[in-house]
Every structure is written in structure tokens, then in C-alpha cells.
Amino acid sequence: MKIVDNFFDPTYFKELQSFFLDQPTRIPWFFVPTMNKDHSEDNTMSYFEHLVYQEHPNSDFYNFLEPVVELFQMKELIRIKCNCYTATEKLVNHPSHKDYDFTHKGAIISINNCDGYTLLQDGTKVNSVANRVLFFDPSEMHSSTNCTNQKARFNINVNYF
């Protein structure tokens, strides 16, 4: 596990952040009724996602994220998805999950500052800080939260080899 603050060049990150915060309609968001594949649909926890890449580009936003692919020096890209966890009055810890059952690399790119966080299996809590990247093995259990002090918590989840 590694945390890197101010990972991206400030100019590029400001453009990236603008897609989410200043021009939210540029990204089509899709409602996901469950937090993960092991989570019951009976629960009220849900979020919005935008699948950018899985086996092939699924979004025009992929071209804008090419610097991410280059900076991570990956052998193979598995998936890129953007997440939008809307705010609630109380912070909600989402159920733990694994992104995939095989060992691989992962990164969570925080787009905005908020009181949300990612909780790793060992108890490490990684706060959502704009331009912070968490590098970790997403085949290990981890969980997300929403936020209470912004309209939403935005991040980009990257899975790769």
C-alpha cells in the first residue's frame, strides 16, 4: 500500500477535477443499486458509476484519462471506473469487497476533498484528499464510504497489471 499526495501535475488535475465538479453533465452517470456483488439489493446503499474501460474503452472520457494509463506504467489495463457516492446526513460505511479475486494492482484517485475515505483490510483509513492516489492490491478486502460535507465523494478506480 502506498499513498501519494499531489500525484498529478496541477494543471492536468484541475482539468480532471473540472469534469466532475464544474461540468458534471459531461460524464453520464449510471445508477448502481448495490454497493458490490456480495451486497443485497434490499439495502438502501447505492451509488453512481461511469465505466470508462473494461476490456476496451467504453467512454469518450478514456482519451482524457490516457495520462493516467501512462503514469501508472501498467502492463495491462483491466478496468477504469468513476464513482459518485452522494452525501447523506451520516457517514455510511459500505460493505467490504474485493474488486477481483485475482492478485493485481489498483489505484483510487480522489477527485475532491471530503470526509469520506477508503478502509483497507488491515484497518488503514485513507481519507479522500483531492489529487491523492492510493495504490494497493484490490484483491484484498476494502470498503468505501460516502460523505457528509460535500454534495458527493468522487473518485476514479483503476485496476491493472
Identify what each model region corresponds to.
Residues M1-K75:
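Non-heme Fe(II)/2-oxoglutarate
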Residues E70-E89:
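A short glycine-rich, His/Asp/Glu-containing loop-to-beta-strand
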Residues A107-I108, Q150-F161:
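A short hydrophobic beta-strand segment most commonly corresponding to one strand
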Residues K90-P95, F102, S110-V129:
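A short beta-strand-loop-beta hairpin characteristic of the jelly-roll/cupin
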Residues P95-H97, M141-N149:
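Short beta-strand His + acidic residue motifs that chelate non-heme Fe in jelly-roll/DSBH
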Residues A87, V126-H142:
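Conserved metal-binding segment of the jelly-roll/cupin
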